[in-house]
Amino acid sequence: MPASPLVWINGLHMTEQRPIAVLGGGSFGTAVANLLAENGHQVRQWMRDPEQAEAIRVNRENPRYLKGIKILPGVTAVTDLQETLDACELCFVALPSSALRTVLAAHAERLSGKMLVSLTKGIEAQTFKLMSQILEEIAPQARIGVLSGPNLAREIAEHALTATVVASEDEELCKAVQAALHGRTFRVYASADRFGVELGGALKNVYAIIAGMAVALEMGENTKSMLITRALAEMTRFAVNQGANPMTFLGLAGVGDLIVTCSSPKSRNYQVGFALGQGLSLDEAVSRLGEVAEGVNTLKVLKAKAQEVGVYMPLVAGLHAILFEGRTLEQVIGLLMRAEPKTDVDFISTSGFN
């Protein structure tokens, strides 16, 4: 049975349901919109392209993303952002990191007091701000959260058993999201570490590119395991430097998201890496994908930030050297393997069993 269509807002279950907004017409936004509709909610999925919206209304399928997935009747594709924001209290923001600020800044006054939950796993290039931090800057009176985890959009849409994390210091927002999304195939856990959960989701995209390259080059299971494990160490080291809780990275939004993104051909960033491993240029790999691969943009800003704050991230530096500095894969592998080994796990005692 679908969940009750009651929404938990301001600490109370409301008897009159308001529609829920999903901002963005991509694959993940579409999957979340369908989840909400399956749970009995009326959903307004906003997108900029009128042709895309019309195709969804007529054919009940997103023509660009998630082909073959029928969009439920409870989802209405719309193009009027002002009207959508005025009608909805709970808004899931699934806009590309490069567009989020531009799209929402013009409607800042309408965001005050609303629950804004970012679904975007990216970092703004100019400021190194995460998406929830941009939302906070645009709408300081809004209630902010993030949703992140091992969540491949097509698998969610096909009802594979899936779990995710909603993170916010606002406990009532977490309850509202859990009430709206939790269903027979989708489980929602809560966390107060918004920064750690969101940073995990953004950073792992870089390592998915590396993992895709390794698979294309048939590097073997030992290599793939090493890459994923050392990626987790790098991510955690950087996140703790920035103020996150290292324990967050042992959960769904850390190691969980990293594993699925680095091991699944359905991952967009993995696909880019695989194409690179096959010999395509970066431009060719991104063009073949036809969708946004946040890891490419994240790599640039993460490399610069790691240097600025003095965090050791050899995998990030190595991938950056291949994609943007003209180094060959063989050169980078040689440098990585000759580097002095550090301790295996940070944040635990290195002095024996004390």
From Swiss-Prot:
Cytoplasm among keywords: yes
Residue intervals passing through the bilayer: none
Amino acids binding NADPH: S27, F28, R48, K121, A153, R268, V292, E294
Binding site for sn-glycerol 3-phosphate: K121, G149, K204, D257, S267, R268, N269
Subcellular location: Cytoplasm
Keyword entries, A-Z: Cytoplasm, Lipid biosynthesis, Lipid metabolism, NAD, NADP, Nucleotide-binding, Oxidoreductase, Phospholipid biosynthesis, Phospholipid metabolism
Major enzyme class: oxidoreductase
Pathway: Membrane lipid metabolism; glycerophospholipid metabolism
Gene3D superfamilies xrefs: N-(1-d-carboxylethyl)-l-norvaline Dehydrogenase, domain 2, NAD(P)-binding Rossmann-like Domain
InterPro entries named in the record: 6-PGluconate_DH-like_C_sf, 6PGD_dom2, G3P_DH_NAD-dep, G3P_DH_NAD-dep_C, G3P_DH_NAD-dep_N, NAD(P)-bd_dom_sf
Reactions mediated catalytically: sn-glycerol 3-phosphate + NAD(+) = dihydroxyacetone phosphate + NADH + H(+); sn-glycerol 3-phosphate + NADP(+) = dihydroxyacetone phosphate + NADPH + H(+)
Keyword check for NAD: yes
GO biological process: carbohydrate metabolic process; glycerol-3-phosphate biosynthetic process; glycerol-3-phosphate catabolic process; glycerophospholipid biosynthetic process
SUPFAM superfamilies: 6-phosphogluconate dehydrogenase C-terminal domain-like, NAD(P)-binding Rossmann-fold domains
GO cellular component annotations of the record: cytosol
Cysteines engaged in disulfide bonds, as pairs: none
HAMAP family cross-referenced by the UniProt entry: NAD_Glyc3P_dehydrog (MF_00394)
PANTHER family in the record: GLYCEROL-3-PHOSPHATE DEHYDROGENASE, GLYCEROL-3-PHOSPHATE DEHYDROGENASE [NAD(+)] 2, CHLOROPLASTIC
Protein name per UniProt: Glycerol-3-phosphate dehydrogenase [NAD(P)+]
Organism: Pseudomonas fluorescens (strain Pf0-1)
Taxonomic path: Bacteria, Pseudomonadati, Pseudomonadota, Gammaproteobacteria, Pseudomonadales
Gene coding for it: gpsA
